[in-house]
UniProtKB/Swiss-Prot annotation:
Gene3D superfamilies: Cyanate lyase, C-terminal domain, lambda repressor-like DNA-binding domains
Molecular function GO labels: cyanate hydratase activity; DNA binding
Source species taxonomy: Eukaryota, Fungi, Dikarya, Ascomycota, Pezizomycotina
Entry EC number(s): 4.2.1.104
HAMAP family hit by this protein: Cyanate_hydrat (MF_00535)
GO biological process, one term: cyanate metabolic process
Family membership noted in the UniProt record: Belongs to the cyanase family.
Species this protein is from: Verticillium alfalfae (strain VaMs.102 / ATCC MYA-4576 / FGSC 10136)
Alphabetical UniProt keywords: Lyase
SUPFAM superfamilies, sorted: Cyanase C-terminal domain, lambda repressor-like DNA-binding domains
Full protein name: Cyanate hydratase
InterPro entries per the UniProt record, alphabetical: Cro/C1-type_HTH, Cyanase, Cyanate_lyase_C, Cyanate_lyase_C_sf, Lambda_DNA-bd_dom_sf
Length: 166
């Protein structure tokens, strides 16, 4: 894929977020823009999900030493500059609450509107408990309907953790 072609659909760092993210995030996003590589391409090379790889860029997902080696090669940056990715993430601080970015706000709105419905259905199916966001994976897929309209499919898969009686 040419760098010019890749730039049109390439996720980049919103400069207003930069100060809230780890310093390595700027290195990652700059290298991503320079190489024109997508999260999908990186995920295939790392054997991880696109969301996990993107999460590394935002300081929300910990990278393994193997991830750092592969990212270093893919993004053409030193392994040393990516070493902070192996530290424990400081999760949950990337943006304001409630979110102000429109797409992220829509996800927040889904939980506001359907959160209790999700909870009720899960309780009926599994009992009293919660869905783990630790023993968890997620993916984003694109579907196109019969009329040619694009649809987003977000899968959230978490281990069910029943509350214990005490």
């Amino acid at each position: 894929m040419s760098n010019a072609h890749a730039q049109a659909g390439l996720a980049t760092l919103d400069s207003s977020m930069a100060e809230r993210l780890p310093s390595v995030s700027q290195t990652l996003f700059s290298a991503k823009a320079a190489t024109g590589i997508t999260f999908e391409d990186m995920a295939k090379e790392l054997g991880r999900s696109e969301v996990a790889v993107a999460g590394m860029f935002y300081g929300q997902v910990q990278a393994s030493a193997e991830d750092v080696v592969k990212l270093s090669q893919l993004l053409q940056v030193s392994q040393e500059s990516l070493a902070p990715l192996m530290a424990f993430p400081n999760r949950g601080h990337a943006g304001p609450m409630p979110p102000v970015e429109p797409l992220i706000y829509r996800l927040y709105e889904v939980v506001q509107n359907y959160g209790y419905a999700f909870k009720a259905v899960m309780n009926e199916k599994f009992g009293d408990g919660i869905m783990s966001a630790i023993a968890f994976n997620t993916k984003v897929e694109k579907e196109v309907d019969e009329a040619g309209n694009p649809w987003v499919v977000i899968t959230l898969k978490g281990k069910w953790l029943p509350f214990t009686r005490f």
